[in-house]
Amino acid sequence: MKLIKQSLALAVALALTGCGGSESSIQSADGNDSKAGPEREDVAGQGVIRVLSNRPDLINGGDALIEVSVPDAKNARVQLNGKDIGDTLTTMEDGRLRGLITGLALGRNEVAVFAGNGSVVRKTIINHPKGGPVFSGPQVQPWNCTNTNAVDDKCNQPAEFELKYVPKSKFDLFAESFDPASPGLPGAFLPYDPENPPPSEDIAQVTTDEGVTVPYIVRVETGVINRDRYQIMSLFQPQQEWTPLSPQEQWNGKVLIHHGGNVGVSYSMGQPPNGDIAGTAPEGAEILLGDSISVALARGFVTLSTAQANLGHNVNLVTAAESLVMSKEHVIEQYGPVRYTIGTGCSGGAIAQQHIANAYPGIYQGLIVQCSYPDVWTTATQFADYNLLNEYLGNQISEDPADLLTFVESLLASPVLAVQWPALYGHLPLNPIVSDMAFFPSAEPDQENCPGLADQAEVYDPQSRPDGLRCGLVDYMASQFGERLPEVWSPNEQLLSRGFTGIPLDNTGVQYGLKALQDGVITGEQFLAVNRDIGGLDIDINFQPQRTIADPEALKNSYRTGAINTAENLANVPIIDLRGPDPGIAHDAFHSWQVRARLEETQGHAHNHVIWYGAFPLAGDTIFTTEALLVMDQWLAGIESDQDETPVPHKVIAHKPVTARDRCLSLSAPFSEEGPKAPYTGNLFYPEPQVAGLTPEQIPTLPAELGQILDVATGQVCGLDLGELGLPDIIADPLQPIADEVVEAKKLVVQTRFGTPRTVAGEAITTLNNKCQLKPVDPADYPVNILNGVYTSEGFAQKVSEIFPDGVCDYTQPPVGEVPTLTWLQYGDEQTVKTGGEPLPTSTDKVAGWASPAFGVDLNPRGDL
């Protein structure tokens, strides 16, 4: 056992003994007396039983990794539900007992440790089905099991294992096997047959970050948890055993969770995503587009992905979090306790991380987000606005080429000239088109091809099947948002005598194009016309002449549950955001700064947030994910080493490495302590050169300090900061107004930090107003401009008041329905839903197996509300 693992074990032991005593030993995870059954006359013993693999009340699958710390532990008698299980526990070097206990019954179980003096220590464990739910409440139905080995309707099956390896030269192998008739990029791994293994000289050798050198052979475990697939990969030595008490030496105790992109729903099983930008870029492109997953494996990480945490397969953040909780428990029970966990993912993979980290803190210790958004439901407001403006302007491209003439005619007939459209959208017109084609259809409850349904139910049709299954994004959030109230029921809801899932979107009072009017880009008549005729969306996500009105309960619950990510619970996690320009592919660059603004609003700072910007579209640079993994690993290792009682948010800032700094360009990549990296080369040269004849020794190592200087210098390209240049005030002060204008121009030209219809309407970059508070129309908002038809502010304001009789958005006020985001909410059991969720009971235990003690992981609801 290497030094770091010994130190971790000692730190855990100290944490456990510090929580000993009769009080903690007789309390269950839910805070109730842990005695199961009639009152006992037992004498409470000294010591503690600790569940390492999860909170004791969240255990699933019938097993749990536990640790017993009592005096004279080797002579104690251990029972599970009255049956001796002492032979399943192993005495560790420090005298503690540790082991994987199995055979837990569904519901409450009791572990009891009897000492020789007749005293007893007890712990209640609440076990949930491996197929779920644990805390998400009633599961989506119907559900289609697509695995042939399923043994029940929860799709459960035994885990399956296969071995793969990385060839010594992937590039040479690719060149030798390239088929012009079927071109493609090589995958990261090749099949490994233990009965007929490849020659050892054909297998790459890797040295982990702890100095262990092994062949680059990977074991891939696949199985089913929570009715859907998971995948675990680990660097593996086929001839050796691996147990949670004795992991193979190449594991460094760290976990990397990777996620998939897009957004959607499904009524059947999916596939765990692979690749940093899975779902956003083609599979197999890792060698060119970057692959931090294979780099992590080579460094000794275990990697995890689940289909349920793939946003393109499952928009519901609660079941996504639940799948990670259950799967991370499985990792600990089969592989061993974890030091810390890093997330990575692009687009929907970034949303999933930031959603989950804010609503269920403790699952991750660090986030690497790429081509990111903050969440689904404020982004949905942007995309809904796009859809309405597209309808109004005629900016809609049919998939049928025959309709091209119709599109051209709509352009010519548009009430606003095409050159004026960006002033309304806040972005190039291509962005709304991509949004409408790629994402908006997922919101429609009557999707023609409802994903995964497989004819198990008929899909909703407002005319012919009002009782059909509604297949939209909102409908997948029923437990979180709740049903609509009877007073707003549509005819179909009245027919069914039940409300559909409420919509947390609203455009009441939104003045579309306000900034465009103020800047003189559109005329007063155009401004009045778009706001008079823009309309809204009904419950079926169809256009209606009236503005969209949010359902109050859904709106409040969207904040409460974390569906709207206010970023108020992210201070415990470092975040590295990787960003490139977006000319109109609906992955707006401004989202990185949107998250930063939310952090600044809730935390008072954004010191735990780093933005790396590069020229590669959306992603910034193809080497960013690998670089970010190395920097995040360094950041978390620093936090892990801090055993002080300092709050974790303070540790996050205190141990921020110098390499965790904002970047405008990726030119500093060659100046790296981990070895030089060439921008835009993916994994061609790092960690091992894949070009024939090139070795690491031939690539010169450059001073890392030069990288810091280069980042400061190139940072001026993106956001001229005179303070960074160290100029005296007498020079800097007169230049500052000019610099401010330059900065604003560079945000647009260099970083494509465009806006949205709501920022054009006056909302701040945080864009947290899914529904705004209203104020009376103010003539001051409409400066006189004879050229665009605003002759008097008062007269124009009167016309605006006729369109907005109840007032217009007041973005100086908090959003309507905004409440604090509660963490670790539960939504009932398989039969009964708790709409909007209720916080889990507070646990008295740290979940010691989830992360090193310095991270203080307890999986508890927020205690400061």
Residues covered by each model-derived region:
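C-terminal motif of bacterial Sec signal peptides marking the signal peptidase cleavage site
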Residues: 16-18
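Bacterial signal peptide processing site
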Residues: 20-23
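C-terminal His-loop and adjacent cap/lid subdomain of alpha/beta-hydrolase
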Residues: 33-346, 350-865
